[in-house]
């Protein structure tokens, strides 16, 4: 079981594989429009509803939404209405969903998205992690110091609606106007294992890249995964319509295998959260939160207690566990010293995965922040160890 859902062997195998890839820094994540829908932002159809109405069309009857946006541009010969729609919708303040928060906590170094919103950025900020956002060509040559993740917003950002990728002209020019993004995405698809969530695979740019990779790397392609919702009977008026949609979807999912994308089919969107939670849980099994605060150590002298803590910390690092510490008085410094000595002894690079430090805040506002700090540290740990109080 994963939470409340029955975990089939395919999903279980995927989670084991993806956790391994995350630990080896070989994982990437792709967030489509469906990833932000739970936050209250609209999907593409709803976003373009007013545009369709202005054209005398019904958005529910339109399947090519890129063409619909292009028709609006053709009519007015400018992007004014389209930009207004994007700005009006995404200027609304929304909070990251649980899925965004889990994603931000996961040690994934590369995230791609077609979304214009800033929910991923907010989620990273909430867990005090530095994310390097790339939404324009000029951003690609800049490197943010101490970044923990790169977020590629390949269709632009809500703050620059005029540059957002939405109409046919944008897609047709993308290979030339944004070839740097295509090159970066191609490299990641070749070298990393992707998990696609909330993505429909109707994007012409991604289709182009996947086709090229399939041809160029046919002998040894990278395996990717996509969480896809099953076809629901209640969404269709008749059994015949449902059977047709299901048959077409089955053929579509089978076709994804040509690009080495395995579909993980779920019945309810809540299962996305439970799968992400299980990924985080398995990752955290190797993370140990060591806490304690002491001025006296009972039957131990101060030197004996510190040596014990240092030996424990060093042995945990030696056995491939990761340590999380809040730098508690009388305990935290020994935890850090033991871990660092073991890391340096083996010439290993220090990073937030091996040793994550979250010193507790001091001063008048400390109490306000303490709860947030505790929740952040404990959420990253699979085991909690309390020493000397």
Feature-to-residue mapping (PLM):
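Conserved catalytic-core helix/loop/strand module for nucleotide-ribose chemistry
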Residues: 2-284, 342-345
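Acidic/glycine-enriched connector segments
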Residues: 296-298, 304-389
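A short alpha-helix capping/helix-coil boundary motif
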Residues: 78-80, 163-164, 290-292, 381-383
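Short loop/turn segments at strand-loop or loop-helix junctions that form parts
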Residues: 31-33, 155-156, 229-230, 287-295, ...
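Charge-rich interaction segments
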Residues: 269-294, 304-312
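Short glycine-rich, polar/acidic loop-and-turn segments at beta strand-coil junctions
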Residues: 33-35, 51, 117, 294, ...
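Long, contiguous hydrophobic alpha-helical segments, chiefly transmembrane helices and signal peptides
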Residues: 111-112, 116, 154, 166, ...
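Conserved short-loop catalytic and cofactor-binding motifs
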Residues: 87-91, 300, 323
């Amino acid at each position: 079981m994963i939470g409340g859902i029955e975990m089939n062997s395919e999903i279980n195998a995927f989670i084991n594989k993806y956790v391994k890839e995350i630990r080896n820094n070989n994982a990437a994540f792709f967030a489509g429009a469906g990833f932000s829908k739970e936050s209250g932002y609209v999907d593409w159809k709803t976003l373009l509803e007013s545009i369709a109405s202005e054209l005398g069309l019904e958005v529910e009857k339109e399947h090519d939404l890129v063409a619909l946006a292009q028709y609006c541009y053709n009519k007015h010969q400018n992007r004014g209405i389209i930009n207004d729609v994007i700005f009006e919708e995404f200027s609304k303040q929304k909070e990251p969903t649980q899925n965004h928060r889990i994603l931000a906590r996961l040690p994934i170094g590369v995230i791609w998205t077609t979304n214009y919103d800033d929910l991923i950025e907010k989620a990273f900020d909430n867990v005090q992690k530095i994310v390097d956002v790339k939404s324009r060509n000029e951003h690609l040559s800049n490197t943010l110091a101490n970044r923990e993740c790169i977020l590629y917003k390949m269709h632009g950002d809500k703050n620059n609606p005029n540059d957002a990728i939405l109409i046919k002209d944008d897609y047709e020019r993308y290979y030339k106007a944004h070839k740097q993004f295509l090159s970066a995405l191609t490299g990641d698809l070749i070298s990393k294992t992707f998990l696609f969530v909330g993505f429909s695979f109707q994007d012409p740019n991604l289709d182009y890249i996947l086709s090229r990779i399939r041809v160029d790397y046919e002998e040894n392609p990278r395996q990717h995964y996509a969480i896809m919702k099953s076809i629901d009977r209640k969404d269709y008026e008749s059994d015949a319509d449902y059977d047709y949609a299901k048959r077409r979807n089955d053929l579509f999912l089978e076709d994804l295998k040509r690009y080495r994308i395995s579909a993980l089919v779920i019945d309810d969107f809540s299962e996305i959260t439970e799968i992400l939670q299980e990924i985080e849980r398995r990752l955290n099994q190797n993370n140990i939160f060591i806490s304690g605060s002491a001025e006296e150590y009972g039957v131990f002298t101060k030197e004996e207690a510190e040596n014990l803590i240092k030996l424990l910390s060093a042995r945990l690092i030696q056995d491939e566990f990761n340590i999380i510490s809040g730098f508690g008085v009388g305990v935290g410094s020994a935890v850090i010293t033991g871990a660092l000595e073991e890391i340096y002894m083996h010439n290993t690079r220090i990073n937030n995965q091996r040793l994550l430090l979250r010193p507790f805040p001091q001063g008048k506002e400390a109490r306000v922040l303490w709860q947030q700090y505790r929740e952040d540290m404990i959420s990253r740990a699979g085991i909690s160890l309390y020493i000397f109080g």
